Amino acid sequence: METTNMNNPIDSDKVDKLKEKCKWACTKPEKIQKKEGKKISEQRKEQENAEKEWGNNMIGQSNNGQWTTLLGEGLVRDILELRGENPRKPERKGGFEPDWETDDYMYEVKTSNWWVAGTAGEKVLGTWIKYQDIPTLYNKPLKIVCVANQEYELEYGKVKYFGDNVSEKTKKILELARTWEIEYIKFSDLIPNNYK
């Protein structure tokens, strides 16, 4: 039996499920290749449906179109517990209710599935502006956790918040966010090595 921290033992099934979720969050699927007799769009739809079915299974639901929200929030909570950070639901303040509060931080979770198309993830770019008052309202810094494709897109997509290729303009914006006690973080950086 493994333990999440010194006080909370968890069973091996829960550990295996958590590792499976972490692997999903940190592993970009391979690019779809042309196959004879099957269009790329058909393959993409199959992958999208398979991911949705898997995600719904992970959250104990079926056909929930917003499964990534519940999966990402639950996954971050589990990892925060594993790290001994005492996550809990915060009380609503100033019309806001971030996803998690710990003893030292507030957390807002932004998750995007791997087969999402278009500009669905772009709203995360302005999350720090929307939640600018959270550090003052809760008297704790805010960490915006980017999970799965959301993390990938912010490291390898058009607008980079992570990695070596962040533009000078974006660095200035992220520095301004830090002066407000707001920081974007990669989910993969939260995960203990034995769960990757």
What residue ranges belong to the model's regions?
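Conserved catalytic cores of phosphodiester-cleaving nucleases, focusing on short active-site segments
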Residues: W100-N113
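Soluble or luminal CAZymes and related metallo-dependent hydrolases
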Residues: T68-G72, T119, K123-G126, N165, ...
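Core catalytic machinery and nucleic-acid-binding channels of phosphodiester-processing enzymes
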Residues: P90-E91, D99
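Acidic-basic catalytic patches of nuclease active cores, encompassing PD-(D/E)XK
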Residues: E2-K89
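Hydrophobic, Leu/Ile/Phe/Ala-enriched alpha-helical segments that form helix-helix packing faces
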Residues: V76-G84, Y131-Y138, I173-A177
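Catalytic cores of nucleic-acid endonucleases
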Residues: T111-F162
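Beta-rich catalytic cores
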Residues: F96
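Domain-level recognition of nuclease-like catalytic cores that cleave nucleotide substrates
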Residues: K143-K196
